[in-house]
């Protein structure tokens, strides 16, 4: 959530940053500023009325103490004025409460501000390529799409999964299930060795958690909700792991806090009709290892780069060709102030596809979730910065392996680093 004080003091600058996100200028600060002025006017009036009410209470006490008859005209007039003030105050209170509620609702609809260093752009076409890695590992043969080789190997069940659930669900069997499990364990082991503390969080989460990380209220239609409880299926482990610290104050000496977590993830994929209808790229349920950091604002940028490196390390260990993109303002995620996407090479389509999105959210999520830090010897608290990224999306990693490691005889070589997990060299 954005800082209302910052909006109030620098409305033109904040509006300009929001406009960088949207060519249609869909984010208008005017309704917030109007309500903020009304609320502050009411607050000022209420303060004056309360001061006068307190003054009258003291006057009545002083006069009665001095021996003036409580039924005297003077005291009765003061009591009448005091009652009138209480009536006015009682009428102002719900007005102010309503305005505060409306301001908060409007603030929750606003995305994070792009950093000054985020490239300007309108869409993904304007994202900036930072680097490529692994050209020497590009396949030398023509390969089949990952879903076709998986079905030929008998490791992927689509029709039976659809029978159980609906479209965009799959079942992995035999070596496919083993490869998925091996990838999860390998990814977790790598990140634990990099200093992340593993968490197994709930995957059913409440609305406060989704609001804290920015999925609610704006993106409710993209998540699955339980019909009888205030519980949602987690779209990413970023949500429950970040919310472990909701409404808490951490000591500065504890930072950075670094967690990795494997969870199944659930997304309705609203608006993706007709896209990636086959294979492992776009599913309603998929597995992912997530990286989450809570960091000091002063180290935020360096910690972000480190998180990107941690995600890249998985692709490098697997020897999968990829590229790193810095997202432009028009393609930036709702909660991010700066973001790098890792895209892995899928040779069957001749394209790079996103496999990790590494975001620096600044204090945006921390303000929504009320996660603060306290420094020794300093008064007050400040909001932490939160970072998150996939380390990695497991299904998409499997898709990349099935394509990049295909052999001319129709088998798939197991990457060297996964062979100790799978106890085999060939699928």
UniProtKB/Swiss-Prot annotation:
One Gene Ontology CC term in the entry: cytoplasm
EC numbers, comma separated: 6.1.1.11
Record's comment describing the protein's domains: Consists of two distinct domains, a catalytic core and a N-terminal extension that is involved in tRNA binding.
Reactions listed under catalytic activity: tRNA(Ser) + L-serine + ATP = L-seryl-tRNA(Ser) + AMP + diphosphate + H(+); tRNA(Sec) + L-serine + ATP = L-seryl-tRNA(Sec) + AMP + diphosphate + H(+)
Protein name in UniProt: Serine--tRNA ligase
Assembly notes: Homodimer. The tRNA molecule binds across the dimer.
Encoding gene (name): serS
Residues given in the record as L-serine binding sites: 236-238, 290, 390
């Amino acid at each position: 959530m954005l800082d209302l004080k910052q909006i109030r003091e620098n409305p033109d600058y904040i509006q300009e940053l929001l406009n960088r996100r949207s060519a249609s200028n869909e984010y208008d600060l005017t309704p917030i500023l109007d309500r903020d002025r009304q609320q502050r006017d009411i607050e000022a009036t209420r303060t004056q009325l309360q001061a006068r009410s307190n003054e009258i209470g003291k006057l009545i006490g002083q006069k009665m103490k001095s021996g003036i008859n409580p039924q005297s005209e003077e005291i009765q007039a003061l009591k009448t004025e005091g009652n009138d003030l209480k009536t006015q105050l009682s009428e102002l209170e719900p007005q102010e409460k309503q305005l505060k509620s409306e301001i908060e609702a409007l603030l929750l609809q606003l995305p994070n501000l792009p950093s000054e260093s985020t490239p300007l752009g309108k869409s993904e076409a304007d994202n900036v390529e930072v680097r490529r890695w692994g050209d020497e590992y590009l396949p030398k043969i023509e390969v089949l799409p990952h879903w076709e080789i998986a079905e030929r190997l008998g490791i992927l069940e689509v029709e039976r999964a659809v029978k159980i659930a609906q479209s965009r669900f799959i079942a992995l069997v035999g070596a496919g299930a083993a490869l998925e499990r091996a990838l999860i364990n390998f990814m977790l082991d790598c990140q634990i060795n990099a200093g992340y503390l593993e968490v197994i969080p709930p995957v059913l989460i409440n609305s406060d958690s989704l609001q804290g990380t920015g999925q609610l209220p704006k993106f409710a239609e993209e998540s699955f909700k339980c019909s009888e409880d205030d519980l949602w299926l987690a779209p990413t482990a970023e949500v429950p792991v970040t919310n472990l610290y909701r409404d808490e104050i951490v000591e500065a000496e504890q930072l950075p806090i670094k967690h990795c977590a494997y969870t199944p993830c659930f997304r309705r994929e609203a608006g993706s009709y007709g896209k990636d209808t086959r294979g492992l790229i776009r599913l309603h349920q998929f597995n992912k290892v997530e990286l989450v950091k809570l960091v000091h604002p002063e180290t935020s940028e360096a910690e972000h780069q480190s998180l990107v490196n941690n995600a890249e390390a998985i692709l490098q260990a697997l020897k999968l060709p990829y590229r790193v993109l810095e997202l432009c303002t028009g393609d930036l995620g709702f909660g991010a102030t700066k973001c790098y996407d890792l895209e892995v090479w899928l040779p069957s389509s001749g394209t790079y596809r996103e496999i990790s999105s590494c975001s620096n959210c600044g204090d945006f999520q921390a303000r929504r979730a009320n996660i603060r830090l306290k420094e020794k010897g300093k008064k007050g608290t400040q909001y932490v910065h939160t970072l998150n990224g996939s380390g990695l999306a497991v299904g998409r990693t499997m898709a990349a392996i099935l394509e990049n490691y295909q052999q001319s005889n129709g088998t798939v070589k197991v990457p060297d680093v996964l062979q100790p997990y799978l106890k085999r060299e060939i699928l």
